[in-house]
C-alpha cells in the first residue's frame, strides 16, 4: 500500500501481545498500537530501542527483517485484526512457532527462536550488576559558593562553572581531574587550578567517598558527558597546517597514561573502569569528526582498552546516530574491541534494533528525576523490554537531571532488583551519590546496595538463565497466567527470577514528610502459594490483592515464595577479591543460603569467574570461561 507493507492476522478475544522493544511505560499491547521507530524519546509513551519483533500468547512470533519504521496495531482499529505495517515496499519476515501449552514455555521457545536469528543476549560481568558512577572529570571548573547546590565529600557547597563557559574550564577555578594531576603535555591552554586542595574534585575522591561511607560500587566511567573529551593533555590544541601526527600522538598517549593511572587506582579499590563514547574510536577518525575541537577530544580506543585497562563502554545518540543499523554497527565495534582484551565487555547504549542484545544492555536515556513519575513509568518499561528480546536493561538512579533524596532511595530499592543501575552525576540539581544526603536516606541506600551485593549468586544465576531462557525481570503472567496478569493491572510489580516478587513504591499514596507510606494493589498469585514478607517474615496467602501494605521509607515491598532457596554471599562492596586496599571485596568461599521450607524444592546455582570472555568474532561464539553448577536441596 503506497510503499508500505502490511501483515494482517486474525486475533482472538483472549490473545495478548508483547514485544516491540523499549516501549516506555508499556509492556502489554492488546487493544493498542505501538510505533516501531526510533523516536529517541525517553519518557512515558515514547520509544527508544525499538524492535520489529512481537509474540503472541497463541504461540507465534514475528520478526520483520527491516530497518524501516513501522506501526503495530494490536486490535486498536479492529478488535479482530492485528495489523503490522512497515514503510517499505518489500515484505520480509521470520515466523516463529511454539507448541508449548503453557505461556512460560511459549515465551521461552519464541524468545530462543528470535535469538537463533538475531543472536543470544550478552552475559554481563559480575561487576556490572553493582552500582556504577558516571561523570565527566576532564571538563568542569568549580568554586566555593553559598548559593551553590552541590555538596561534595568535604561537606561544603560549590557551584560548577565549566558547562556555562562552553565546556572550557575558567581560569583560576578548581579543575576536575581523574587523579588530581593536571596536564603536562601541550597544556598551555589549560587555565584551571590543580593543587592539594582540589583532590575533592577528582574521580578518585568519589571512589574514596564510597569506601569511606561503606557503599558498594562496581564500575566507574570518568568521562561521561558532552564536551568531556578523553583527557586534559593537549587542551584545545590542534595540528597546524602541514604538521605531522607526532605531537598529536604524544597527547593521546599522555591521556591514555592518565586513564591507566585512574584504572589502577580504581581496581585497587575493587572498581572496574570504562568510558563514554562521543566520537570516533581512533585519532585519525576523531580529527575528521565535525565535533572535534581540540586534542583533548582525540582518542585511541584500542589503547584505552589494552593499555589503560577499561572494560566498559557507554554510548548514546552522539555515537549511535539515528539508531537502526548504525546503532548495531556502533555497539558491535565497541564490543569487539573490548572483547579483544579477554575481559567480558559491559556496553550500555540506546536507540537499538533487533540484534542489539548481542552487544549491549539497553539504557533508557536522559530523564529528569526528583519525581514519582520517573519510577512509575520505568517499571512497565523494564517488564516490556524483558519480553521483547533483550533481558538487560537499566537506567539512571533518580534520573540524570533534577534530584530528590526520597526518590533516590525509593529508586535504589527498585533497582536493587534489576540489572544495571547508574549514578549519572554532574548534570542534576544535586550530586548523584548515595552518601551525599542525610539519614535516614544514607543508611537505607547503603542497606539496599549491600543487599544487592549479597544477592549476587541469585542474580548472576538468573542472568545466566536469561541468555537462553526466561528474562530476569518477569511479567506476573509468567508466574500465573490469566486475564488479570496479562493486563495493565499488574504493571507495577514483577517477578525477579523464580522466587522474588517485587512491588516498588512508585507514588505518594499517603506519605509523611520522610516518605513512610503504604503500597496498594499488590497481587499475590497462586491460591496454593504462600508469600513471605522478605523483611519481616509475615506470611500471606496467594490469590489475593493486598492494599495498605506498610511501606516505611526503609522498606521495599518484597516477597519471597514459600519453598524458595536463595543463595547469597556475605556482605561485600564489590566482586573483586579482598586485598589490603580492597578490604570490602568479595570472598567467594564464604556463602549464605536462605531456605524457605515447603515441600521438596531445589535450586541450581550457576557460577563462573564473572569476568572472562573467549570470543570468536567471526562466528559470534562466546565462551565465558567455563561454569560450575551446584545443586542445592
What function would you assign to each model-found segment?
Residues 1-8, 12-15, 22, 216-445, ...:
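Aromatic- and carboxylate-enriched substrate-binding clefts and catalytic-loop regions
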Residues 1-185, 189-193, 207-212, 549-570:
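Catalytic and substrate-binding clefts that recognize carbohydrates or anionic sugar/phosphate headgroups
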Residues 32-41, 46-51, 110-117, 202-208, ...:
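Short alpha-helical segments and helix-capping/turn motifs at coil-helix boundaries
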Residues 43-47, 104-105, 145-286:
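Aromatic- and glycine-enriched glycan-recognition loops and surfaces
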Residues 49-53, 58-60, 91, 218, ...:
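Residue-level detector of short, conserved catalytic/binding motifs and their immediate flanks
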Residues 110, 199-206, 262, 301, ...:
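Alpha-helical packing segments of well-folded alpha/beta enzyme cores
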Residues 336, 356-362, 381, 387-395, ...:
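Catalytic core of carbohydrate-active enzymes
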Amino acid at each position: 500500500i503506497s510503499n508500505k507493507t502490511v501483515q494482517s492476522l486474525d486475533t482472538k478475544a483472549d490473545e495478548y501481545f508483547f514485544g516491540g522493544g523499549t516501549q516506555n511505560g508499556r509492556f502489554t499491547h492488546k487493544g493498542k498500537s505501538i510505533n516501531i521507530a526510533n523516536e529517541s524519546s525517553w519518557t512515558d509513551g515514547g520509544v527508544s530501542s525499538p524492535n520489529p519483533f512481537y509474540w503472541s500468547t497463541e504461540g507465534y512470533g514475528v520478526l520483520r527483517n527491516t530497518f524501516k519504521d513501522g506501526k503495530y496495531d494490536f486490535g486498536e482499529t479492529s478488535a479482530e485484526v492485528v495489523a503490522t505495517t512497515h514503510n517499505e515496499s518489500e515484505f520480509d519476515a521470520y515466523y516463529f512457532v511454539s507448541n508449548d501449552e503453557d505461556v512460560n514455555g511459549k515465551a521461552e521457545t519464541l524468545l530462543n527462536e528470535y535469538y537463533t536469528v538475531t543472536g543470544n543476549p550478552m552475559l554481563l560481568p559480575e561487576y556490572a550488576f553493582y552500582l556504577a558512577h558516571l561523570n565527566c572529570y576532564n571538563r568542569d571548573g568549580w568554586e566555593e559558593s553559598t548559593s551553590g547546590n552541590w555538596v561534595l565529600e568535604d561537606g561544603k557547597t560549590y557551584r560548577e562553572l565549566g558547562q556555562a563557559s562552553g565546556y572550557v574550564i575558567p581560569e583560576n577555578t578548581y579543575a576536575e581531574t581523574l587523579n588530581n594531576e593536571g596536564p603536562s603535555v601541550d597544556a598551555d591552554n589549560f587555565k584551571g587550578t590543580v593543587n592539594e586542595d582540589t583532590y575533592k574534585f577528582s574521580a578518585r575522591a568519589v571512589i574514596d567517598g564510597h569506601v569511606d561511607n561503606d557503599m558498594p560500587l562496581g564500575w566507574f566511567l570518568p568521562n561521561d558527558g558532552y564536551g568531556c573529551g578523553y583527557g586534559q593533555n593537549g587542551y584545545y590544541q590542534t595540528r597546524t597546517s602541514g604538521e605531522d601526527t607526532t605531537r598529536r600522538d604524544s597527547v593521546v598517549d599522555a591521556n591514555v597514561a592518565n586513564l591507566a593511572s585512574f584504572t589502577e587506582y580504581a581496581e585497587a579499590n575493587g572498581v572496574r573502569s570504562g568510558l563514554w563514547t562521543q566520537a570516533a574510536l581512533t585519532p585519525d577518525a576523531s580529527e575528521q569528526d565535525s565535533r572535534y575541537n581540540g586534542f583533548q577530544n582525540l582518542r585511541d580506543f584500542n589503547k584505552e582498552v589494552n593499555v589503560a585497562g577499561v572494560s566498559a563502554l557507554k554510548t548514546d545518540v552522539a555515537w549511535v546516530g539515528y539508531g537502526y543499523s548504525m546503532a548495531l554497527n556502533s555497539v558491535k565495534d565497541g564490543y569487539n574491541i573490548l572483547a579483544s582484551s579477554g575481559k567480558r565487555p559491559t556496553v550500555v547504549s540506546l536507540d537499538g534494533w533487533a540484534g542489539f542484545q548481542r552487544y549491549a544492555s539497553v539504557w533508557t536515556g536522559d530523564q529528569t528525576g526528583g519525581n514519582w513519575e520517573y519510577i512509575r513509568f520505568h517499571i512497565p518499561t523494564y517488564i516490556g523490554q524483558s519480553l521483547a528480546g533483550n533481558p538487560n536493561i537499566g537506567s539512571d538512579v533518580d534520573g540524570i537531571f533534577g534530584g530528590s533524596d526520597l526518590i533516590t532511595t525509593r529508586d535504589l530499592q527498585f533497582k536493587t532488583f534489576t540489572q544495571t543501575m547508574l549514578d549519572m552525576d554532574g548534570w542534576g540539581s544535586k550530586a548523584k551519590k548515595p552518601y551525599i544526603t542525610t539519614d535516614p536516606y544514607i543508611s537505607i541506600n547503603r542497606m539496599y546496595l549491600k543487599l544487592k551485593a549479597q544477592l549476587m549468586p541469585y542474580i548472576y544465576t538468573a542472568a545466566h538463565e536469561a541468555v537462553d531462557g526466561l528474562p530476569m525481570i518477569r511479567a506476573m503472567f509468567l508466574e500465573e497466567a490469566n486475564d488479570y496478569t496479562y493486563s495493565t493491572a499488574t504493571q507495577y510489580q514483577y517477578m525477579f527470577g523464580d522466587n522474588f516478587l517485587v512491588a516498588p513504591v512508585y507514588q505518594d499514596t499517603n506519605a509523611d514528610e520522610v516518605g513512610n507510606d503504604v503500597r496498594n494493589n499488590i497481587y499475590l498469585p497462586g491460591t496454593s502459594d504462600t508469600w513471605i514478607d522478605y523483611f519481616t517474615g509475615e506470611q500471606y496467602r496467594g490469590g489475593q490483592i493486598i492494599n495498605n501494605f506498610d511501606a516505611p521509607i526503609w522498606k521495599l515491598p518484597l516477597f519471597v515464595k514459600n519453598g524458595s532457596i536463595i543463595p547469597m554471599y556475605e556482605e561485600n562492596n564489590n566482586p573483586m577479591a579482598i586485598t589490603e586496599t580492597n578490604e570490602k571485596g568479595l570472598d567467594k568461599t564464604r556463602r549464605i543460603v536462605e531456605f524457605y521450607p515447603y515441600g521438596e524444592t531445589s535450586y541450581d546455582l550457576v557460577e563462573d569467574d564473572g569476568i572472562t570472555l573467549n570470543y570468536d568474532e567471526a562466528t559470534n561464539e562466546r565462551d565465558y570461561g567455563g561454569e560450575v553448577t551446584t545443586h542445592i536441596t
